[in-house]
Amino acid sequence: RALAQRGYLYSSSLFPSPPYMLAKWGVMASMLLRGKRSQAIWGNPSMMFASRSPHHRRSVLEMPITVLPGIRFPLIGTTLALMGTQGYRVARPLLKQAHFLNLEFHGIDLIDLEQDGIDQTLLAQRDLRISLHSKLETFSMVLEDVAQGWDVQTLEELAPKFKGPRAR
């Protein structure tokens, strides 16, 4: 409701991925057991099994982050970096079954710890151990596939065109 009241047409906060949510909760629980607090949000368990397709929730269009069909493995910058080109080649046939893609990347996906002189304590985050060169090779492969297989639009461009089902 808050988004609709502020005039937003869409949201992209839904991440329907059991593997991601279970891993996230495992990390957060481990931190709690060690006396540390995470700033991450636990999230609603029902999110894991929500629709992978765009749909209306109240008066706002929800455009979920892409997960692979069937296995619901998350396809975001972090996991693509960890997969590398070999892993992406394995996932590619599943991705081609998806009729909607919402690929999420963050600025941190383009960091190279050595080149950028980032604090070595961040090596605890596995995707930061991967060179920028390797990440760019994987991201380029993915984005070339996307450009060839889908009509590329921003969510802002797509939202007003969507005519799918409305949830009450």
Task: Enumerate the predicted regions with their spans.
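Active-site-adjacent pocket scaffolds in enzyme catalytic domains
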Residues: R1-E104
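C-terminal domain-boundary segment and adjacent tail
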Residues: Y10, G77, A81-R168
